[in-house]
Amino acid sequence: MTKTKAIDIIGAPSTFGQRKLGVDLGPTAIRYAGLISRLKQLDLDVYDKGDIKVPVVNIEKFHSEQKGLRNYDEIIDVNQKLNKEVSASIENNRFPLVLGGDHSIAVGSVSAISKHYNNLGVIWYDAHGDLNIPEESPSGNIHGMPLRILTGEGPKELLELNSNVIKPENIVLIGMRDLDKGERQFIKDHNIKTFTMSDIDKLGIKEVIENTIEYLKSRNVDGVHLSLDVDALDPLETPGTGTRVLGGLSYRESHFALELLHQSHLISSMDLVEVNPLIDSNNHTAEQAVSLVGTFFGETLL
């Protein structure tokens, strides 16, 4: 596996997987913060495919539930469209960089990617496990369920997108500090490789990422998807996200993590999710996100 020089940027401006308006503006905020020019300065072939068309938010229906799930029909629509766009990028041998939007969009992106690999690995860089199922979800918010859906459990219509499920043993969770009871049990039952914030404190981010790389190589993965939720970072530094949990990764730690992942040449696709400019300060979180992506694609000081 090698890092491709050809990148497709795909916006997925979904706000339907959670309750706070504004995360649908994430792709625009990230572009406004200079993403395209930042990547082109690295001599990369960058094509912005624009945003997929998403349903209009109906405020009266925004908090309604179907099958115990919020905005279920809208999320199906978003993920079906995103699945097609990401599949097209993979088929054209381009690196899909998907901009959320809330984390429910990972169902569409990762399910598309997994069809093109025999043994895909996933790095879930997040404060949360996103391993809930509807029956156990405290909120009914689908942004807390995408990784469980990708392993083959969840609502039927979303599972239909995913013909090649992700093996739990091919998943690495990094930055965990807020897990629901059912998620903790699922992690234990399936022995999912997990680095909590306590582990990161003990080991340091360098050892965590090096262990992650070696672990996925030992699993003989033929591609690795990086799903980066900005709520993995500490909200005191990175405030523009909707599900904040104190005590997260620092901006500096995250830079180093992405630098190491770049050097590994292991990552074959990426999501960047949960940037919400309406609760940010002067687009600070989007600017941080752009800097992190630049580092991931090889940007250095010297």
UniProtKB/Swiss-Prot annotation:
Which InterPro entries did the record assign?
Arginase, Ureohydrolase, Ureohydrolase_dom_sf, Ureohydrolase_Mn_BS
Source organism's superkingdom? Bacteria
UniProt cofactor note: Binds 2 manganese ions per subunit.
**What top-tier enzyme class does this entry carry?**
hydrolase
Obligatory cofactor(s)? Mn(2+)
CDD domains, alphabetized = Arginase
- Amino acids binding Mn(2+) 2: 126, 128, 229, 231
Pathway(s) served: Nitrogen metabolism; urea cycle; L-ornithine and urea from L-arginine: step 1/1
What GO molecular function terms would the record report? arginase activity; manganese ion binding
GO CC, any one term: cytoplasm
Q: Which UniProt keywords apply?
A: Arginine metabolism, Hydrolase, Manganese, Metal-binding
Instruction: List its EC numbers.
Output: 3.5.3.1
Q: Which residues bind substrate?
A: 128-132, 139-141, 180, 243, 274
One GO term under biological process is:
urea cycle
Reaction(s) catalysed (UniProt annotation): L-arginine + H2O = urea + L-ornithine
PANTHER family in the record: ARGINASE (PTHR43782:SF3)
Q: Which family does it belong to?
A: Belongs to the arginase family.
Q: What is this protein called?
A: Arginase
